[in-house]
């Protein structure tokens, strides 16, 4: 029997994001960025090289949800930023031993949706942070608008490519 430090249940976007972190892809803040309050700005600067080390309770005390803290860096405006303007970057660190268990493969339940299915959000809101969907479109020769709704037939190959890139 194999033993692993972490078992991930499910290969959907959530499981893939956890897998990326366990594989060693960790965020950092870089360049010019601004948070809505000077107090949170100072907190972000303190943790810019390792945002995963911050105490989420400290954010909550300042009136900010932790998920919004990271979203403000990944998607600071409604439309997608060019990759060279991203202030959320990723560094490869040591991996943790992990195994993903899934019956659906990378993308999870998206593999079982109707072939005509579109998402309810733009492509760049469906991406997993360290592998931008715009980069996937370029690498696979897809001429797509990353601010438009993404089609299932683009999303599933993106999640599969994401898993392979881990």
List where the protein language model places each region.
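Active-site catalytic pocket residues across diverse enzymes, especially alpha/beta-hydrolases
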Residues: 22-30, 114
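Short glycine-/acidic-enriched loop or helix-start segments at secondary-structure transitions
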Residues: 18-19, 110
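Short boundary motifs at domain starts and secondary-structure transition points
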Residues: 1, 88-91
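A conserved beta-strand/loop element that lines the FAD pocket in flavoprotein oxidoreductases
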Residues: 164-166
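Glycine-rich active-site loop/strand segments that organize a redox cofactor
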Residues: 33-77, 91-158
